């Protein structure tokens, strides 16, 4: 899920004179692996009968608690001004949409397909930001969007989709749109604050919605055994770790390199789904997956313009 956040205004930059950039690279790659592990573990729990609402409620509750503890331990601010606090909590709605859409899609389509569709979120952000922030749509980015959607058509296959597959595709697309909404709304309403504090509030807002849907839904805590609960907690820890590792690495190598490296997330997810869930990609679908990832990388390339990433877009973010 997870592909949630970004810095929403506070200037982030690579630490000057950083002599060990490989540590930053390793942290961002570990972050990508954390996000990937979280969705794969949650998908395993879904296949064992755990409901989507149950899974998201537990995962994001654990992630929120872990992020809160890390913020306090690091002496970083937790509180926000009233205006920014309400805006960040409001972003929890988009967190909720992303969680329901992304994880819900794995009930109907393979995880490897869901992550590719979900990862088209930056493309939606690209076109929306043209009107909200006058972000230029360059030829490179238009070509990248075309490549990504061409690859997506290959990855989904040329055959007609079943009703359940259509539900999965639409669910993943809703998650991608939720991600784009998070990025766009956050960059317009929240500025000059610690991005991790924004993440904390938005995750908390999303968690509250997940819990409400869990307790007022038709089948609360369905399929939640002790083993499944441990798995979901592990998934939540992976999310929390991923956020902490990402921003630690970003400070060392800057947002441009961090955004590029985070594009390894779908690669990790597809690989993990193959080994853990037994998912397989045909030759044509493998090419399609490669094209999607290539398109997203091109969108985030420095020469294409300001990085448009699912987790790192923000005004004021720059690299020294």
Language-model segment annotations:
Residues 54-65, 95, 102-136, 175, ...:
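Specific alpha-helical transmembrane segments that line the substrate/conduction pathway
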Residues 45, 55, 59, 105, ...:
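Hydrophobic/aromatic residues within transmembrane alpha-helices
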Residues 57-58, 114-120, 185-208, 239-275:
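Helix-helix packing/entry segments at the starts of transmembrane helices
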């Amino acid at each position: 899920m997870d592909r949630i956040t970004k810095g929403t205004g506070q200037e982030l930059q690579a630490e000057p004179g950083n002599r060990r950039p490989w540590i930053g690279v390793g942290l961002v790659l570990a972050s990508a692996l954390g996000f990937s592990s979280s969705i794969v573990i949650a998908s395993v729990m879904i296949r064992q009968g755990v409901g989507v609402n149950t899974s998201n409620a537990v995962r994001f509750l654990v992630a929120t608690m872990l992020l809160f503890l890390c913020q306090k331990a690091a002496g970083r601010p937790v509180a926000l001004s009233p205006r920014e606090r309400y805006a960040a909590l409001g972003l929890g709605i988009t967190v909720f949409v992303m969680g329901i859409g992304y994880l819900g899609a794995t009930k109907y389509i393979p995880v490897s397909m869901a992550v590719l569709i979900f990862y088209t979120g930056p493309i939606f952000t690209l076109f929306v930001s043209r009107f909200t922030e006058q972000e230029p749509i360059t030829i490179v980015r238009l070509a990248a969007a075309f490549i990504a959607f061409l690859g997506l058509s290959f990855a989904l296959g040329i055959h007609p989709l079943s009703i359940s597959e259509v539900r999965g595709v639409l669910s993943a697309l809703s998650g991608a749109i939720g991600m784009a909404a998070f990025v766009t709304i956050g960059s317009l309403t929240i500025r000059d604050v610690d991005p991790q504090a924004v993440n904390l509030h938005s995750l908390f807002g999303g968690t509250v919605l997940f819990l409400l849907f869990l307790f007022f839904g038709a089948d609360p805590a369905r399929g939640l055994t002790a083993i499944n609960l441990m798995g979901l907690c592990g998934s939540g820890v992976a999310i929390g770790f991923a956020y902490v590792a990402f921003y630690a690495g970003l400070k060392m190598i800057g947002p441009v390199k961090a955004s590029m490296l985070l594009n390894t997330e779908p690669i990790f997810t597809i690989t993990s789904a193959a080994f853990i869930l037994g998912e397989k990609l045909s030759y044509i679908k493998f090419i399609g997956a490669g094209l999607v990832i290539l398109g997203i990388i091109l969108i985030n390339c420095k020469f294409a313009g300001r990085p448009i990433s699912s987790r790192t877009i923000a005004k004021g973010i720059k690299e020294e």
